[in-house]
Regions:
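Short, solvent-exposed polar/charged micro-motifs at secondary-structure junctions
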Residues: 16-17, 56
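A short, charged, amphipathic alpha-helix used as a generic interaction element across diverse proteins
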Residues: 8-10, 20-43
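Short, mixed-charge low-complexity intrinsically disordered segments
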Residues: 31-77
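Short aromatic-glycine-(Arg/Gly/Cys) micro-motifs in beta-strand/loop hairpins
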Residues: 1-15, 74
Length: 77
C-alpha cells in the first residue's frame, strides 16, 4: 500500500495528514497555504518519493514556509 504524508517543516511545523495520492496531499497543502492567507506557492517536481511546496516571502535569512510530501510504501502484512 502506498501513502503520502504531508508535513510542514518551518514555522507551522507538524504533520498535516496522510493521503492516498500525491495529488491529494498537494491539494491539501494548497488549502492550508490559502487559509493562512499566503498568495504564492511554488512546487518542486515530485521525484518519485518527495517534493516540496514553498510559500510566503523569504525572511532575513532567505527562508520561507515549506510543506513536504513524502511517499511511503507500507507492508500490508
Amino acid at each position: 500500500m502506498t501513502v503520502y504524508s504531508l508535513t510542514e517543516t518551518t514555522g507551522n511545523a507538524g504533520c498535516y495528514g496522510v493521503f492516498s495520492s500525491e495529488e491529494k496531499a498537494t491539494a491539501a497543502a494548497m488549502e492550508f497555504i490559502k487559509s493562512w492567507e499566503y498568495e504564492n506557492a511554488e512546487e518542486t517536481i515530485f521525484d518519485g518519493f518527495h517534493k516540496c511546496i514553498y510559500y510566503g516571502e523569504p525572511d532575513a535569512y532567505g527562508n520561507c514556509g515549506c510543506f513536504e510530501i513524502w511517499k511511503h510504501e507500507l507492508d500490508a502484512t
